[in-house]
């Protein structure tokens, strides 16, 4: 087996990350298992780095440098006192700058540049209509829209009315036959 194959075989034999224990170079506080909720779920409690990432290092939080009595006002500068651009004084920055004049100047330069550009016309295969009104809008109840579907709808309503009318007449006849079957034979 060559040297390269030996290295590959060694790499395959390494333990998975969950079984790795802290090395002897770690401090004694990190060698002890951390007691937390994550300790019961898996072997994460024995690895202080994973416990710290997952928030299970409650026992190590006693050596914190944070003082609850110290206010945040003394540590963090308020954002309204911080200048984003110290090089320019904001009072004198826009002095002599008129938005309307600058906009007019930019537009004049733009028009002068593009008026000097020669645009040659090409033969185009697509032509658009020159009319102002390209779409003709009609109301939904226009006579032009009437068709065979409307006749079918009228026929359907007429037949429904006939069925209800004949049902009233025939129901009384059938009810009499049902009540007195001997009388009608």
Curated annotation (Swiss-Prot):
Annotated region (Important for host CHOP inhibition), positions in chain: 126-128, 170-174
Swiss-Prot/TrEMBL keywords: Host-virus interaction, Inhibition of host innate immune response by virus, Inhibition of host interferon signaling pathway by virus, Interferon antiviral system evasion, Late protein, Modulation of host PP1 activity by virus, Viral immunoevasion
Region Disordered: start-end pairs: 1-38
Segments of skewed composition (Basic residues): 1-15
Molecular function terms, GO-annotated: protein serine/threonine phosphatase inhibitor activity
Record's keyword annotation contains ATP-binding: no
A GO biological process held by the record: symbiont-mediated suppression of host innate immune response
InterPro entries noted in UniProt: PPP1R15 (IPR051254), Prot_Pase1_reg-su15A/B_C (IPR019523)
Entry superkingdom: Viruses
Induction (record text): Expressed in the late phase of the viral replicative cycle.
Subunit composition and interactions: Interacts (via C-terminus) with host PPP1CB.
Family per record: Belongs to the asfivirus DP71L family.
Role of this protein: Interacts with the host phosphatase PP1 catalytic subunit (PPP1CB) and recruits it to dephosphorylate EIF2S1/eIF2alpha and therefore restores the host translation that has been shut-down by the host. Also inhibits the EIF2S1/eIF2alpha-ATF4-DDIT3/CHOP pathway.
Name the record gives this protein: Protein DP71L
Species annotation: African swine fever virus (isolate Pig/Kenya/KEN-50/1950) (ASFV)
């Amino acid at each position: 087996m060559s040297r390269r194959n030996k290295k590959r075989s060694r790499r395959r034999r390494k333990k998975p990350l969950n079984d790795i224990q802290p090395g002897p170079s770690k401090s004694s506080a990190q060698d002890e298992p951390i007691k937390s909720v994550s300790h019961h779920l898996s072997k994460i409690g024995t690895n202080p780095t994973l416990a710290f990432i997952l928030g299970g290092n409650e026992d190590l939080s006693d050596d914190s440098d944070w003082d609850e009595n110290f206010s945040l006002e003394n540590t963090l500068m308020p954002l309204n006192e911080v200048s984003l651009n110290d090089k320019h004084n904001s009072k004198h920055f826009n002095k002599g700058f008129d938005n309307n004049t600058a906009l007019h100047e930019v537009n004049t330069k733009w028009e002068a540049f593009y008026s000097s550009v020669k645009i040659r016309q090409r033969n185009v295969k697509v032509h658009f209509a020159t009319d102002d009104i390209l779409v003709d809008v009609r109301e939904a109840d226009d006579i032009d829209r009437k068709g065979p579907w409307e006749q079918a709808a009228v026929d359907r309503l007429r037949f429904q009315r006939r069925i209800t009318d004949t049902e009233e007449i025939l129901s009384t006849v059938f009810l009499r036959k049902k009540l007195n079957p001997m009388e009608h034979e």
